[in-house]
Amino acid sequence: MKPGEIIVKRTEIEVNQGHNATILNVKNTGDRPIQVGSHYHFFEANPALQFDHEKAYGKRLDIPAGAAVRFEPGDEKEVQLVEYSGKRKIYGFHGDVNGSIDESRVYKLEDDSTATEVIAEQDKTSENANKGRG
């Protein structure tokens, strides 16, 4: 053993062990590749990605930190998502949440044939200092 050397077990590393998983089919309907990072709120991913948004609310990809999933134009693949843990607050991304994760804020558009889920405008409140800024 060398000074500072770390010897680790030669076993499989399980990421997000104990988290409930959700599997979604995702299709890139756009004309450009799209990459989604490991901790990106999947609900707020690029609008060219077609998937069940309601099931993605409050969840991120079940992949190691720093990794990403790439969707080429026309690609359709299955992804596994896990819920955010900790305080369960999300800020940034597209600004759709900017606060606590609350599934009651998600609703289906009744007059839209694609049944895309969105967050009601009156529910887009922010707890941060930049509230109301671009």
UniProtKB/Swiss-Prot annotation:
One GO biological process term: urea catabolic process
Compartments, record wording: Cytoplasm
Gene3D superfamilies documented for this protein: Urease, beta subunit
Keyword line: Cytoplasm, Hydrolase
TM segment ranges: none
GO CC term, one of those recorded: urease complex
EC number: 3.5.1.5
SUPFAM superfamilies per UniProt: Urease, beta-subunit
Quaternary structure and interacting proteins, as annotated: Heterotrimer of UreA (gamma), UreB (beta) and UreC (alpha) subunits. Three heterotrimers associate to form the active enzyme.
Similarity annotation: Belongs to the urease beta subunit family.
NCBIfam families from the UniProt entry: PRK13203.1, urease_beta
Protein name: Urease subunit beta
Origin organism lineage: Bacteria, Bacillati, Bacillota, Bacilli, Bacillales
